[in-house]
Amino acid sequence: MGLSAPSDRDVVSYTPEGQEGWVATRLDFLVNWARANSLWPMPFGTACCAIEFMATAASDFDLARFGMERMSFSPRQADVLICAGRVPFKLAPIIRRIWQQMPQPKWSISMGACASTGGMFDNYAVVQGIDTIIPVDVYVPGCPPRPEGLIYGIRMLQEKVKNERAADKGTRDEMEPDPSSQLYIPPSLIDELGEPFGNSVNQTRSGL
Amino acid sequence: MTRRTVNVELSTTGLDAQGRPQRVPILTDDGGGLALQAPPGIEPDLEGEHMLINIGPQHPATHGVLRLVLELDGETVVRCIPHIGYLHCGFEKIGEYRQYNQIICWTDREDYLNSIGNNVAFALGAERLFGIEITERCKVLRVIASELSRIMSHLVWLGTFCIDIGAFTPFLWAFQRREEIYRLLEKWVGARLTTSATRVGGMAADIPSGWMDGLRQFIRTFPHTLDEIDRVLTKNAIWVGRTVGLGVMTPEEAVNWGLSGPMLRASGVDYDVRKDFPYLDYETYDFDVPVGTNGDVYDRYLVRFEELKQSVRILQQAADRLPDGPVNIDDPRIILPPKSKATSEMESMIHHFKVVMEGPRPPIGESYVAVESPKGEKGYYMVSDGTAKPVRWRIRPPSFVNLAAIPKMVEGHLLSDVIAINASIDIVMGEIDR
Amino acid sequence: MSRFEVVKTGSSASGAPPTTQKNVPHRNGEPNPSAKALQEKFPSAIERVEVVWGETVVFVDAWSVHEVIRWLHDDESQRYDFLSDVTAVEYRDAEVPIEVVWHLRSLPFRRFLRIKAQLQKGTALEIESVYDIYRSADWLERECFDMFGIRFRGHPDLRRILMWEQYREGYPLRKDFPLRGRFSRSEQLRQALAQNPEARYSMEELSIADAFAELPEDMRERLSKGERTGE
């Protein structure tokens, strides 16, 4: 009864030794500034969003002012994977392989409704969101997003890049789902959890 | 109607004695004309195995997610096997679960370069199925929409074709012109690319006031860009050298392979759906259909370029003849009643409810309406069983049938020619894979 | 030297230049003259002729389709040289058979004709291919097979075109195939990711490249028995 003594687990330590020094923060700033302002995109453009991406890269909206005019179609030379367009299941291993071929540091932007959630294509053929295949940093909604929308998403990504710290050890680790970890959810449990929202086996949606 | 066809002539060398395409060498000191000389004797490729290389599905120059597997003898293509389906999204299946007005949103996304043209095509097909005659104003607006979308699609084709050959600047010029059309469309229907501008029985919205001035401004300034691009490309020796004599299809082959649109017309067959099976009163507009005589990539470029000019001509006539009057038909069972009536009269409210919740129901039957899309003969085949959702919605994709001919066209050409030939077909994977 | 004479569409057509059709009747419009010619030439194969919204639909017996289409292509008074589409329709009513539909155009005569053949559900869905008449049938028939499971006899390379070859859920456009597929989303994703994108060369492609000879013995045996590596 009453207050119990605080255990070690509940105390967060803010000792000076745990913080970064001045040099480390300046280095972080420099590296992040360089990365954010020269993100080389890998346009994984499939459908209509790819046309809006091309319009964003063209003269009127001009991605070159953000340092992104050099489209690298080889994933090995790219920083950002911009998935512009719908991804069907046949294309799923391709985008996964492209993501694996990109070297760290890498980020990804899911452009458009179809890349983010499957969009208007809730059917047998389309992946319901590329975040089921690759990790996504920024989702840009729209069908297709206006060039200003995509630029807003790119600016958000730049903010995210600038807030990274070299001291965060785990940021740039590649994660494969480890079946033995507690983060892994087996497929049968996924089906069970998703059941109230309807899936193809039960077709509980209202016949749409 | 005046001249039916415009023969586009160019003295090409075509094929040489060995049956290989002749190359036009870079201009040296001729100063004026094109120096068409036979290239020096072609060395036979060194004896060796054939190489199998894979282009795509992720590739900058495949115009979408297309995969080409090429068997190469040195650098010459011996065989080409295309693989498609990487953008298959089940359009036709989902069309069976949507009302006719809802399907219009899907027609934007399949050929996304010609989105408003697809909306028009689908609305025409649905109106044939319903047995509706649309108003005169709607017809002219749809002609304006179709021609604007033809210009948009050809500009993307031009830009990306130039990039594939190596010229980057026309891409920027083309996209700048497209931004003007985007602004016009945005004022009209609210969206740039995925317009969903038509409805069964009319249009989603009438043009706002002042829109026609914007259109006339575009018509006035667009030919200058065309002249600029023409100056830079058409007689350019590098351009001619990279495109002449490639991917030749004879007229009989082209018809048998089911090619349509500029691919077919470049081979000398003057089939244009607007002239041969007209719709939207196209027979009353005065325009020419360019027809090539060589069937190669250069002729396809010339045909599409000329089509851009003809589209401007049609736009001018349409802008001059736009009649006043209602845009939508007056049938409340099919098209939404005006909001003022729907909120005040009971009957209109019921009609509004029925049209939105259930959707208009056509009689039992089927219809196939084909339009001339920038890619070719685009058709929507719809079968109705009397309910609000079609039994079958089939898209006849011109790029699908055009692309099937690529193994025939690239045989015997070099690897870099494969890219040029692929670009000249003007494919849209969204339409091919649906 | 490739220089072709311009082939004018409608060179054999008679009458006034074509105009936009207006006020087309639902049924019983003017049929295409080819329908009458077909009924005279193939009286037993033609089941019936309908005119729906101005378009002539000829129902042909499934076993005579190839002969009929061959005649339509070759005969000088018909000359249907352009195959616009090959597709199929399955109705929601389970009793109604599946229809295979061909859209033919005669460019010299400016005519459009729809040929339909009915295949009973429950029997093997097979019909003759028109690949030898029209090369455009190549991919169109492959797509019809992919979406409906209809086999085209005589097609040189009938395999799936839009879905991947080991797609196990079935034929998507059939009415008994649910909109979202038969498997759950996670299972669909797992099957899709299980394809190895790099091992996607088919038997045909490997044999071209002479890589076949360099494969290990057991793999060659498995491949020649028909196992697929990928596409």
Which stretches of residues belong to each language-model region?
Chain B
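Metal/cofactor-centered catalytic core regions of large enzymes
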Residues: 2-434
